[in-house]
Amino acid sequence: MAQSFTGKKRIRKSFGRIPEAVQMPNLIEVQRSSYEQFLQREVRPGVRKDEGIEAVFKSVFPIKDFNERAVLEYVSYEFEEPKYDVEECIQRDMTFAAPLKVKLRLIVFETEEETGARSVKDIKEQDVYMGDIPLMTDKGTFIVNGTERVIVSQMHRSPGVFFDHDKGKTHASGKLLFAARVIPYRGSWLDFEFDAKDVVYVRIDRRRKLPATTFLYALGMDGEEILTTFYDVVPFEKRTAAGAEGWATPYKPERWRGVKPEFALIDADSGEEVAAAGTKITARQAKKLADNGLKTLLLAPEALTGRYLARDAVNFETGEIYAEAGDELDVTSIEALAAQGFSTIDVLDIDHVTVGAYMRNTLRVDKNAVREDALFDIYRVMRPGEPPTVEAAEAMFKSLFFDAERYDLSAVGRVKMNMRLELDASDEMRVLRKEDVLAVLKLLVGLRDGRGEIDDIDNLGNRRVRSVGELLENQYRVGLLRMERAIKERMSSVDIDTVMPHDLINAKPAAASVREFFGSSQLSQFMDQTNPLSEITHKRRLSALGPGGLTRERAGFEVRDVHPTHYGRICPIETPEGPNIGLINSLATHARVNKYGFIESPYRRVADGKPLEEVVYMSAMEESKHVIAQSNIKVLNGEIVDDLVPGRINGEPTLLQKEQVDLMDVSPRQVVSVAAALIPFLENDDANRALMGSNMQRQAVPLVQSDAPLVGTGMEAVVARDSGAVVIAKRTGVVEQIDGTRIVVRATEETDAARSGVDIYRLSKFQRSNQSTCINQRPLVKVGDKISAGDIIADGPSTELGELALGRNALVAFMPWNGYNFEDSILISERIVRDDVFTSIHIEEFEVMARDTKLGPEEITRDIPNVGEEALRNLDEAGIVAIGAEVQPGDILVGKVTPKGESPMTPEEKLLRAIFGEKASDVRDTSLRLPPGVAGTIVDVRVFNRHGVDKDERALAIERAEIDRLGKDRDDEFAILNRNISGRLRELLIGNVALSGPKGLSRGQITAEGLAEVQPGLWWQIALEDEKAMGELESLRRLFDENRKRLDRRFEDKVDKLQRGDELPPGVMKMVKVFVAVKRKLQPGDKMAGRHGNKGVISRILPIEDMPFLADGTHVDVVLNPLGVPSRMNVGQIFETHLGWACAGLGKQITTLLEDWQAGGQKQALIDRLTEIYGPDEELPETEEELVELARNLGKGVPIATPVFDGARIGDIEDHLRMAGLDPSGQSILYDGQTGEQFKRPVTVGYIYMLKLHHLVDDKIHARSIGPYSLVTQQPLGGKAQFGGQRFGEMEVWALEAYGAAYTLQEMLTVKSDDVAGRTKVYESIVRGDDTFEAGIPESFNVLVKEMRSLGLNVELENS
């Protein structure tokens, strides 16, 4: 396989045996595709699909005024270019958004008074600005007010119809009460439910229940129609046969199966008895009777008793009703009907066994009998207290379920409904129909009769994903509907003939709804930017919480649990550990979301036991119809080897015959998410620990030096590429220039005139992430390197050579060491601190604003009252700290003074005033100082000035530096373009005939020497004889001019933005941001972890010479407790240790061979060793230079990939240990660093990938003497952020009580807490050097007294 630019610098050996049938999709595709469908920014207005913003506008427009004199129609929309690019938005705290322009058409009608005919009087079209819509960056994020945010996708219950029961909890008898619920995408919910008496009721929007037949009456049905819809009708005809009189009915075998008749069955045609009374008729007998020609049965009159009439018995001449449909027949009523001449009676086919009388009983309970009463009943339930009228009730009922404005099932809802109810309505049919309601009721009654299954709401076929686009579409619709009301009112109140569309529109509600969604929605989250993996996982997260979703309190176990349909769709491992467990999930690696919002997983087709190349994506509903084999089944020559293979049918694991199989998994890792797929030997870890491992990888802090893991899974490169942390080449080309901040590439693959032939990649240098970690990119290329499109040309945070590198490979020994690794503590070597192995840089941001106050403007200045020169040493003349200054807690970063109000003067001030005749300083010091716990280096300062405020010297210096940078970019790009065009011009001119030209060029054929005499800038003046060549020369000249103009225009545009004032909050004149880089070395109290959930806190840093060492004198870096493994069952870490040990051993061998070769030995020995390690199929570098680079990179260890569920076996590990010349047990003899003695038994030593987590002791340590107090209780605040105190709670009080330490206790509860007067006195006495104090009344007692008084209980304190 062809290797990438970084791939050939360090080849990762894979142990995977199963070939990937499908390439991994882009990991942030979920976000991107959803938002692209919403905006349709690249699609021309005429051909846009009816989705996203287009669908919203079409659903709200046209808007008519109240008397229909005018209509405002929607034509199309388009986005303008965003005002600032992503980088500028982050720097200026702005939102990266594009203005939305909508073309609207206002049509005004006039009506003729005589005829009432309408005609168009006027049509006006206009583009109207409808606010800004945030744009998504290439990384799938949004920049809102300068911070990167992610919109998390939401899982919610799919629209459609669901059947369920109460699990026997409602009624004491444990009877199952079935219910059906029709859930639309938007609109009222419709519930049908049984009660304990088997009567069917309906609820609309969970309000008071009504008999279900009321709803059917409202739909226009009558009692007889309802009964004949739900039940078959059986005719009984009065007849005499063989002297016996009875009622004849057609014989249907299925109706008599398993029945024990109370009376003899007689053949109505022959008069014979075909079945005796009291004997059970078997299925075989019933069929045999039909085969013998039995057509009609004659039953005794008693057989009709207890049956129900299917139709009204009416005398059509007199109109008299003898019996109504649904009436129960008894002997008397049967005789009465026979006496009235009814020779045929139609009854309902209800036998109370397979068909129950539920709808008939409901009809009996229902007191309504006509549609009008039913509508009134529904109206009273929905709008209690309003007197109903027929029109109002009719309109309300229609608007509830049958009006597309108010009710929308959505395409998904209709598809789901069609599937569940076996209907075939078009998915354009978004409202309910009578047929739907009847089908729901029939299925519900069928469930009660024991036919069919209820739905599983946790099945992923019944849950769907709402991604960014859909969430924003719903929000925007709400905003437009608010706007619609305002437009209608305005259309009625203005002179419609003179207004233009923009006069009618106030876009604020629409813009506000978008702003509110991005700013404060539960699903719009501050991006977790700790490292590239945490970014990617955040974008792939699925949350069941949020508006329209679940709440933590209400969610039970079932919703949170892993479901068989999660396989290949949602990761069963990665989920938070707290109250959100199971509610927040992660998308599996290969999963994607289809157009209906259902998660699909890929499968390979299998035909006749042969896996095909074809890959299909299936949702949970489609998958249930297939037989699926696992991906690790043996396949030889395109055919499955084993006759029985493991697989699953409908989610249940089983053994299958290979002929049964019609699908198979594409990859073993398709089950898990990205974070879980990064854990090697995941298959050997307990699931709980794997969960912690995948969660802790997201908390790994980017280190100063990153190492890709020796033992990886092959996912590292994919994650690094898709996360956006690395820089990827857009086009094939050659590296022209390079420095720490940018890479300039001359494109070689295309000569498209419209596109520049130069790509300039700007690198992020020491930028602050959302979590204050450091974003820094480093180039991987050299000048002259040839790169291809898609190659990684610069590493980012936590990446190395284009692979994810969250931590470092550390040499670990599993052994106890003097109790310093008790309870998961970690003992580390001083070498790790000395060599900055786990050192990280954190960038803190501080900002200060100079406001215009009532007493005058605040000022940012170096001139601060009562501050010595020492404190100002780092400030420049503008009062702002210099870049590169080392600062300590309490140092001034930005000097600022605030005007003081006129306060009454003290006698001393009056004296000074009298002597010097001037006002003492009238400003106070409000400078920005570095808070405690932060010390570091200033890496960046940004100054923002309000429009029209003069810039200080520092702001101008920053601006000049930025303009120089932009100018350099422009000049470099122009120079390369110029060189390109000059080269093409040179090729064109040489050999052609010149008619005229600049001075120094002779006429006739142009030669290279002749051309060299003339400056390249003058070549344009040459006139050629060949017209075609002259045309090419002109087009090159045009291209040259266009490029120059384009570059100049872009430069001027950027400079103009720089020089313009900044948009600051109201009342702010100037704002300064200071960025401090803090270097955090590893220290006791920091939290570290491996990738297998093996976490611990550093207990001690031991001098190198005291650490245990190997026979060759190498000291180990980390000592871990072996007791942390057995009970936790994360054995993966032991396998990783052994394999890491083998990798390092092989690396040492390669280094030795390389040194031998460079010292004059054989190159072939190195190549042979590499071939032995990688196998004969691996492509090794062709040039010596590349081979040396590869060997150097492998010196630290040969990196290997052990994919999840398809990784290295124990045999492979032993083979590699032997290959590296190590003991196949993976254990080594260790010596005690303190005594030099050998430990009693061999110890497991090897390399583990260790991470430093974002729980650093420096961020947690905190102390306070005095500080802020709570306003009401006057007790100290809590927490480091508020500079709070230590809580002295109930239990601590009990402890002091137990010791009888009365004075200490009194001190804790009064002067050290909320006795305001007492604590002031203590402060004074400490200043005096006195150590006595008096406790007063705590403020909390006063609060209690006030609360009692508010309850009307007067409490007064008496001095006794």
UniProtKB/Swiss-Prot annotation:
Name by which UniProt lists this protein: DNA-directed RNA polymerase subunit beta
InterPro entries in UniProt: DNA-dir_RNA_pol_bsu_ext_1_sf, DNA-dir_RNA_pol_bsu_external_1, DNA-dir_RNA_pol_su2, DNA-dir_RNAP_su2_dom, DNA-dir_RNAP_su2_hyb_sf, RNA_pol_bsu_bac, RNA_pol_bsu_CS, RNA_pol_bsu_protrusion
Catalytic activity annotation: RNA(n) + a ribonucleoside 5'-triphosphate = RNA(n+1) + diphosphate
Q: How does it assemble?
A: The RNAP catalytic core consists of 2 alpha, 1 beta, 1 beta' and 1 omega subunit. When a sigma factor is associated with the core the holoenzyme is formed, which can initiate transcription.
User: Which family does the UniProt entry place this protein in?
Assistant: Belongs to the RNA polymerase beta chain family.
Question: E.C. number, please?
Answer: 2.7.7.6
GO molecular function (one)? ribonucleoside binding
In UniProt terms, what function does this protein have? DNA-dependent RNA polymerase catalyzes the transcription of DNA into RNA using the four ribonucleoside triphosphates as substrates.
Primary enzyme class: transferase
Q: Which organism is it from?
A: Caulobacter sp. (strain K31)
Keyword Nucleotidyltransferase set for record: yes
Q: Which CDD domains match?
A: RNA_pol_B_RPB2
Pfam families reported in the protein's UniProt record: RNA_pol_Rpb2_1, RNA_pol_Rpb2_2, RNA_pol_Rpb2_3, RNA_pol_Rpb2_45, RNA_pol_Rpb2_6, RNA_pol_Rpb2_7
Judging by the UniProt lineage, the source's domain of life is Bacteria
What lineage is this protein's organism placed in?
A: Bacteria, Pseudomonadati, Pseudomonadota, Alphaproteobacteria, Caulobacterales
